[in-house]
Amino acid sequence: MGKKLVSILTAGALLTTLLTGCLQTDKTPQSAPVQPEVKQDEKQDAKQNAPQMVIKVSNGVAEKHPAVVALKEKFKAIVEEKTNGRYVVEVYHSNQLGDDVKATEALRAGTLEACVTSTAPLVGFTKELAIFDIPFLFPDEKTADAILDGPIGEKMSKLMPSKGLVNLAWWENGFRHLTNSAKEVRVPEDLKGLKIRTMENAFHLAAWRAMGSNPTPMSWSEVFTALQQHAVDGQENPVPNFYTARIHEVNKYITTTGHIYSPFMFLFSKKIFDTIPKEDQDIIIAAAREAGLYERQLNREATDEYLSEIEKEGGTVIRLTPEQKKPFQELTASVWDQVADKVGKDLVEELKSEIAKAAK
């Protein structure tokens, strides 16, 4: 009996030991997965391959506009290729980063790298840019190119650094034309009573009042809806601007007044530009200028193409001859003096002289 009891106790102890071992095995945590070792040279390569800077470029026009196309197809491509990817360009359109004024303010503050903007909204920053708000200043694109790429354009560019800006290149917004939903406009008298959306610019407002309309300043992002709801009757812009924004869907009548030629400035934040090595600055400037020539070409080709498309879609295009534009020109002649009072008569006289040279 004693031996039997000892055997039972021994067997029980052995069973307990086995069970305890099994339980402990179940509780043992699994080993963590082995992480692949990142070699020091791989870390260094990743660091070297990361972009040195992301250049965000803002613009207010639509995605299919020639300016946006040129930014993507030329400027972005050239900068990224020439810098071996050290600089990456991101293009924003349709006022995604704010309108021209807000984008320019961001450049001055150093919170945005670049923007392509019309000169008209910038007169509050640099009054001399008002020379480009003189109605019927340039007879054609050739004259505009000569002025922007010559001494006047250089003089305007030299004013920018003191405002916290660097003008990389002159691009083209284009000749501004009238659209409206009410009637055909062939003579100034046809403008009477029409409510026309303009930019927030004193000289543009003065010109449209002089021609007999009721100008109403409004942000570009609000224009389509305002036209659709008949809050305003019409607007004025270069053809690529209003075609790519589908303005002709709510404004059937287009008159090629060509009352103002609007340049684009490709501006860069001086605060940010000053941190970029000289070699890379040169690449960025050269890319902006090459892309600018491409943009001008695209813009001019698009103007003719889009007017034809508008007619095919049922719109009415009134193409004014130089002779037919004269009554509009005569009514707005007083704006020359208004601009001279703001920027100085010497600058306006220099501008006239350069235009005369370009016409020869």
Feature-to-residue mapping (PLM):
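C-terminal motif of bacterial Sec signal peptides marking the signal peptidase cleavage site
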Residues: 18-21
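Bacterial N-terminal signal peptides that target proteins for export
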Residues: 1-9
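N-terminal secretory/targeting leader peptides
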Residues: 23-34, 46-143, 152, 160-360
